[in-house]
Every structure is written in structure tokens, then in C-alpha cells.
């Protein structure tokens, strides 16, 4: 049957951090007394660094999978940097035009559809999705209505815990390798001017080093 090759882009991280170094000169002049003083304010630039892990994923589970097979797959993000972060996951699921069966054995018409399904966990919000011929893309923010701050050293809840291969009729995809790709993104929480998940995701996407 089908093999899954796991390609997890576990460090596609976005660093948007800055510091303004302010120089302040304070002078006071009097008729007979002159006093001058100056102060230089020093700032240290922090960083945003995240990592992704799937502690329960077993690559052997992805070998020779069968219809309706459920596999453990539990991506989560850890803030490895020095600054609070807002984080996102983008999941790309392979699609194909295939025929499937219902639980009672009846057949469905051939259709272009996702080859794997999953159920997202509490704490994550779907903010964007798209379907193409070869893949679907789902973008989740670590958020409720507003973004949730991920402090340094903290780890998110898992986005999902399992993936399920659809009930495909055999011999349609034999010998093919199927990839579920999970990209993770993080950005500083300060000075963004918004806490809207979609607006912040768009800020990340506007950075030149992030693939869209």
C-alpha cells in the first residue's frame, strides 16, 4: 500500500524584532549657573525561536497503510526564544481524485478529496483554508478569538492527536508516497498593532523569507 514520508518543517520560524536606540540629551541653562547632562539608553534585541515536535509519531506506522487506518500524529510548538510569541501551524494534506467506500460497503462516486482527515484540538483556531487538485492547506492560530501568548519555555497544546487515512478503494494509489507537511511560524507579541489572528498571520506572510 501507501507509504507516508514525514516532512515536518520544524523550524520555519519568523524573526520580527527590533529596538530603537534613543539618545537623550538634557540641558539646562541659568543666568549664572550652567548644568549639562546626557544619558544614553541601551537596549538588547531579543529573539523569537520556536520548535515543533510530535512525541507520539512512529514512522513505522506510516508504512503500508490500509483504508481507515488511524495513526498517532501530535504536532505542538515550544517557544525556545527569549521573547513572548504568537504562533501558527500550517498543515498541507495530499489530495487525489479517488473512489471511496462508506461504512456499509456502498461505493461513492470518484471525487477529488483529502486523503487524510484530522480533528483539531481546543486552543487552536482555523483562520484560513484552501483546496487544490493535489493538496489542501489549513492554517491554524494558537488563539481563541484573539491570539494566545506563548511565553518562553512554554509549549502549546497539540494541534491534533491522530490522522486517519480515508476509506479508499484499493489499487488506486498503490506505490505512491504521500506527505503531510506541517509548517510552524512564530512572531513577537509586541508592537504589532493588532491581536487579530488573521492580520498577524498576514504580517508573517509579508516577510520575504517565508514561503507562501
Model-derived regions: residue spans:
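Surface-exposed, hydrophilic segments of mature proteins
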Residues: 2-6, 14-16, 23-25, 32-212
Amino acid at each position: 500500500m501507501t507509504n507516508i514520508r514525514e516532512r515536518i518543517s520544524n523550524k520555519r520560524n519568523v524573526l520580527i524584532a527590533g529596538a530603537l536606540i534613543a539618545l537623550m540629551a538634557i540641558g539646562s541653562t541659568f543666568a549664572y549657573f550652567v548644568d549639562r547632562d546626557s544619558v544614553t539608553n541601551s537596549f538588547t534585541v531579543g529573539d523569537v525561536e520556536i520548535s515543533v515536535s510530535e512525541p507520539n509519531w512512529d514512522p513505522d506506522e506510516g508504512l503500508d497503510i490500509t483504508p481507515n487506518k488511524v495513526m498517532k500524529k501530535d504536532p505542538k510548538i515550544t517557544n525556545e526564544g527569549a521573547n513572548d510569541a504568537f504562533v501558527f501551524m500550517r498543515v498541507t494534506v495530499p489530495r487525489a481524485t479517488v473512489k471511496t467506500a462508506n461504512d456499509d460497503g456502498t461505493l461513492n462516486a470518484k471525487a477529488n478529496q483529502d486523503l487524510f482527515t484530522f480533528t483539531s484540538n481546543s486552543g487552536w483556531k482555523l483562520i484560513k483554508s484552501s483546496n487544490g487538485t493535489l493538496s489542501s492547506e489549513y492554517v491554524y492560530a494558537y488563539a481563541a478569538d484573539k491570539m494566545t501568548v506563548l511565553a518562553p519555555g512554554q509549549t502549546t497544546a497539540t494541534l491534533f492527536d491522530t490522522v486517519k487515512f480515508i476509506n479508499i478503494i484499493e489499487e488506486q494509489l498503490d506505490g505512491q508516497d504521500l506527505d503531510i507537511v506541517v509548517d510552524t511560524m512564530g512572531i513577537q507579541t509586541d508592537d504589532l498593532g493588532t491581536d487579530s489572528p488573521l492580520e498577524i498571520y498576514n504580517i508573517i506572510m509579508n516577510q520575504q523569507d517565508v514561503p507562501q
